Regions:
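Outer-membrane beta-barrel "beta-signal"
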Residues: 78, 197-210
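Sequence/structural signature of outer-membrane beta-barrel proteins
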Residues: 59-65, 88, 105-111, 127, ...
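Mid-length scaffold segments of soluble, non-membrane domains
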Residues: 105-139
Length: 210
C-alpha cells in the first residue's frame, strides 16, 4: 500500500508541477504589462496593429513523460490572430509588446491512427523588440480540443489542452515576417472520463505573418 501510494503521489506531482508552471507563466504574461505601462497607453480595442499568422509543423508525444503511454505523431496547421494589447513596454533588453493570440489549430494525427484533432487556443504572448531583426517571444495558454482520433488511453472526445513555449520572429519584408516556435503541449480530459491518459508532446512550428 505504501509503495502504491508513493507511485500515485509521484504521478500527481508530475502533472501538478507542469500545470503550476503553466499557470505561473500566464500570470506573469497577463499582469506584468499593467505594472510596466501607463493605463492611458493601453489599446484594448484598437486593432490597427493586429495581424494574421499561419504556422505549420510537427509534434510528437513521449511515452513515460508524466502519465503518457502512447507515441502520437501529428502534422500541425495553426492559423491564428495576433491582437496587440500593450505596445512599447519596458526599456533596454526587455523592451517589447504584449499581445493575445487566438488560434484554431488542426492537428492531423499520422500515428497510431490517421485522423484529426481540432482546438481553440487563447494564448498570452510577450515579444522582445530590442533586437534589430530577430525578436524572441514567450507565450502560454490553452483551451478546448475535440479529437476525432482513436488513440488508446484517451477516454473522451472533448478534452482540454494547455501549452507554453518560446519562439522568434525575423523581419523579412514590410508585412511578412518569419516565425519559428518550439512548444510543450498537454492534452487530457481533466478526469471527466476514464481512461484519462494525457498526451505530453513537443512541437516545432514555422510560419509567416501577413
Amino acid at each position: 500500500m505504501i509503495h502504491r501510494s508513493l507511485c500515485v503521489w509521484k504521478r500527481h506531482a508530475v502533472g501538478n508541477s507542469v500545470g503550476t508552471v503553466c499557470v505561473f507563466l500566464l500570470i506573469i504574461f497577463l499582469l506584468c504589462p499593467f505594472f510596466l505601462v501607463d493605463s492611458a497607453r493601453a489599446a484594448m480595442i484598437d486593432t490597427s496593429k493586429d495581424r494574421w499568422e499561419a504556422l505549420a509543423g510537427y509534434g510528437q508525444s513521449f511515452p513515460g513523460w508524466g502519465e503518457t503511454t502512447q507515441r502520437v505523431e501529428t502534422i500541425d496547421l495553426v492559423p491564428r490572430y495576433n491582437h496587440l494589447i500593450f505596445d512599447d513596454v519596458g526599456s533596454g533588453w526587455y523592451r517589447g509588446f504584449h499581445s493575445i493570440l487566438v488560434e484554431l489549430p488542426v492537428h492531423v494525427v499520422v500515428s497510431p491512427d490517421v485522423s484529426t484533432m481540432i482546438g481553440l487556443n487563447f494564448l498570452a504572448c510577450y515579444t522582445f523588440t530590442a533586437g534589430e531583426r530577430w525578436h524572441p517571444y514567450l507565450f502560454g495558454g490553452g483551451g478546448p480540443l475535440y479529437s476525432f482520433a482513436d488513440i488508446p488511453g484517451m477516454g473522451a472526445d472533448w478534452n482540454g489542452n494547455y501549452q507554453f513555449g518560446l519562439g522568434a520572429e525575423y523581419d523579412l519584408l514590410e508585412k511578412h515576417n518569419l516565425l519559428v516556435e518550439f512548444r510543450y503541449h498537454h492534452i487530457s480530459n481533466g478526469g471527466s472520463k476514464e481512461p484519462n491518459e494525457p498526451l505530453n508532446s513537443c512541437k516545432f512550428l514555422i510560419g509567416i505573418t501577413f
